From Swiss-Prot:
CDD domains: Hip_N. The modification Phosphoserine is found at residue 348. The lineage of its organism: Eukaryota, Metazoa, Chordata, Craniata, Vertebrata. It comes from the Eukaryota. This is Hsc70-interacting protein. Residues 321-360 form the STI1 domain. Signal peptide: none annotated. It is found in: Cytoplasm. Homotetramer. Interacts with HSC70 as well as DNAJ homologs and HSP90. Interacts (via the C-terminus 302- 318 AA) with GRK5. One of its GO terms (molecular function) is protein dimerization activity. One of its GO terms (biological process) is response to bacterium. It comes from Mus musculus (Mouse).
Length: 371
């Protein structure tokens, strides 16, 4: 026998031992039936089960990995220590009155609003903070499109330690006049009370840029180091996150490539197993000795064992014949063929079996035409 064919057969058998599911493909059905007709037993397919096990294991590994990553991220976020001295709990009062911005304002209303504003400032100077709030609110309802009224009321809310109310007033003032420094100053102070260090630094810096104020500048110097520390920590965290994402992308590409290569190897193995069927080395076990009784005319009475068929020209053509293939997949025919191959004198037992004799006639005609 051609040593190359023996090597291919050995590789095929090894592959079947490692992955019996190869034998359970439709292409290998004839081989399963032949093995079983000879009293052999084909191992059950385990590849799928293994794949499911591997999939479950991969899911467990992925879940564990995600948990570890979550813990790492939480650890990275929590390792930032900021001095929160002076930070208070946020106020939860209902939103204050803002006035009707679409109302038609008369000269008299503006004059009255200015009077209310003056009275509110007096109350503020006297330490009557709630009275000042009420008077500023009256002024706002009379002239709701005057930004300074909201900024003044916001300053009182800051003194009352109601930062959220102050922020609402400052937001409204900035909508009306974004070039005024006062709303940014008081919103910055409100953010400082809430521990919003970056927002506080931004607003206070903008207030000083629009109209320098020593009070705003002093608070900016207080909050800026904390804001910078947070920004640096965020950059560090983002950098680590980006590095992790890049690493994960590389790993995903690597796994996809490995999976693709594995699929290619499996496909190649299936193709090889199919081609080995087309020129199955060793032919039928036991060979088919020459001098077939009853004759296989045209074969010269000499068919020195199917072992020699592997190298015979035209073997692929024979095995591609649908009738020959159908006969070879018939357990009854294969048993008879094996019986005759082991003892040619047993041919007489099958003279009346048309399926067996039909196969022998076809092989006789094929090989006879090549002699």
């Amino acid at each position: 026998m051609d040593p190359r064919k023996v090597s291919e057969l050995r590789a095929f058998v090894k592959m079947c031992r490692q992955d019996p599911s190869v034998l359970h493909t439709e292409e290998m059905r004839f081989l399963r039936e032949w093995v079983e007709s000879m009293g052999g037993k084909v191992p059950p397919a385990t590849h799928k089960a293994k794949s499911e096990e591997n999939t479950k294991e991969e899911k467990r590994d992925k879940t564990t990995e995600e948990n570890i990553k979550t813990e790492e991220l939480s650890s990275e976020e929590s390792d930032l220590e900021i001095d929160n001295e002076g930070v208070i709990e946020p106020d939860t009062d209902a939103p204050q009155e803002m006035g009707d911005e679409n109302a038609e304002i008369t000269e008299e209303m503006m004059d009255e609003a200015n009077e209310k504003k003056g009275a509110a400032i007096e109350a503020l100077n006297d330490g009557e903070l709630q009275k000042a709030i009420d008077l500023f609110t009256d002024a706002i309802k009379l002239n709701p499109r005057l930004a300074i009224l909201y900024a003044k009321r916001a300053s009182v809310f800051v003194k009352l330690q109601k930062p959220n109310a102050a922020i609402r007033d400052c937001d409204r003032a900035i909508e009306i006049n974004p070039d005024s420094a006062q709303p940014y100053k008081w919103r910055g102070k409100a953010h400082r009370l809430l521990g919003h260090w970056e927002e506080a630094a931004h607003d206070l810096a903008l207030a000083c840029k629009l109209d320098y104020d020593e009070d705003a500048s002093a608070m900016l110097r207080e909050v800026q180091p904390r804001a910078q520390k947070i920004a640096e920590h965020r950059r560090k965290y983002e950098r680590k996150r980006e590095e992790r994402e890049i690493k994960e992308r590389i790993e995903r590409v690597k796994k996809a490539r490995e999976e693709h290569e594995r699929a290619q190897r499996e496909e190649e193995a299936r193709r090889q197993s199919g081609s080995q069927y087309g020129s199955f080395p060793g032919g039928f076990p036991g060979g088919m000795p020459g001098n077939f009784p009853g004759g296989m005319p045209g074969m010269g009475g000499a068919m020195p064992g199917m072992a020699g068929m592997a190298g015979m020209p035209g073997l692929n053509e024979i095995l591609s014949d649908p009738e020959v293939l159908a006969a070879m997949q018939d357990p009854e025919v294969m048993v008879a063929f094996q019986d005759v191959a082991q003892n040619p004198s047993n041919m007489s037992k099958y003279q009346s079996n048309p399926k067996v004799m039909n196969l022998i006639s076809k092989l006789s005609a094929k090989f006879g035409g090549q002699s």
